């Protein structure tokens, strides 16, 4: 294992490979779930800065038969982003991959890396006059990669759909360490298998999402908030249908 750790340090730099070898290093932020109900133990927390480093780390883990736990903001409540307690798994944290690569105002898309905080993406496009409608309670700490990995819904899911409906393309590192460049902004793409939708919601089991091309919308001219009390579930459904027709 020490050879693998040295290899990780060569790829990402010593400062970005955290282990229990140093007693002063606290890995609990990566090893403990958000509710503090589960605690794992990692062989190492590896923090690559770009897709090439992710690819090299994955190749090194594949060659050494080391399991990988991809991790974004670690805000999930289902204990799906922390290692087990074996001390043999690598937590691959994408937090350093937090750049917004481009904003296409003609195609209404933004390309952002997986480690971008959701609120960071929202603010960036709002300043340019657009809306990225994915919104949820953890938006100040969850990452775009985690949203894609779990196919998050959020508070505007009824109108705009899950994260899957907001994504046009992905950049992914496969289990072999190959890089799939699928950051197409096409609204219609019939070329081959729909790997994008297969990968979204797979929680890192089929590949590691490193960047995504996401849909944007014009900012609404005005917003009104109403509190509506309804007598039954059927009435709530009818009200929703009426809102779709009139708003």
Residue ranges and their predicted role:
Residues 1-59, 76-108, 137:
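N-terminal flexible segment immediately upstream of the FAD-binding catalytic core
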Residues 2, 52-55, 62, 119, ...:
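Residue-level marker for well-ordered alpha-helical positions
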Residues 21, 68-70:
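Short N-terminal amphipathic alpha-helices
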Residues 22-32, 40, 46-52, 60-63, ...:
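Feature of Fe-S/electron-transfer and energy-metabolism proteins
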Residues 64-66, 88:
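Short coil/turn segments at beta-strand junctions that form active-site/ligand-binding loops
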Residues 66-67, 131:
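Residue-level detector of anion-binding/catalytic polar loops
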Residues 71-75:
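Glycine-rich beta-strand-to-loop/alpha-helix junction loops that act as flexible
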Residues 99-247:
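FAD-binding subdomain of flavoenzyme oxidoreductases
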């Amino acid at each position: 294992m020490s050879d693998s750790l040295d290899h990780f340090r060569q790829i990402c730099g010593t400062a970005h490979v955290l282990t229990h070898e140093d007693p002063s290093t606290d890995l609990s932020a990566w090893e403990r779930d958000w509710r503090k109900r589960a605690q794992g133990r990692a062989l190492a927390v590896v923090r690559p800065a770009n897709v090439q480093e992710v690819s090299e780390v994955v190749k090194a883990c594949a060659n050494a038969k080391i399991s990988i736990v991809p991790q974004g903001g670690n805000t999930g409540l289902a204990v799906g982003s922390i290692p087990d307690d074996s001390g043999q798994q690598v937590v691959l944290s994408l937090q350093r991959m937090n750049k917004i690569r481009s904003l296409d105002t003609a195609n209404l898309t933004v390309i952002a890396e997986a480690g971008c905080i959701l609120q960071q993406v929202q603010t960036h496009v709002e300043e340019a006059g657009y809306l990225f409608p994915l919104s949820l309670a953890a938006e100040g700490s969850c990452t775009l990669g985690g949203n894609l990995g779990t196919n998050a819904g959020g508070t505007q899911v009824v109108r705009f759909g899950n994260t899957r409906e907001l994504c046009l393309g992905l950049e992914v590192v496969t289990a072999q360490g190959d890089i799939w460049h699928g950051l197409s902004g096409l609204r219609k793409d019939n070329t081959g298998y729909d790997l994008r939708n297969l990968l979204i919601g797979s929680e890192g089991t089929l590949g590691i999402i490193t960047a995504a091309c996401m849909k944007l919308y014009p900012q609404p001219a005005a917003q009104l908030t109403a509190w509506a009390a309804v007598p039954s579930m059927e009435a709530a459904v009818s009200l929703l249908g009426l809102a779709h027709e009139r708003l």
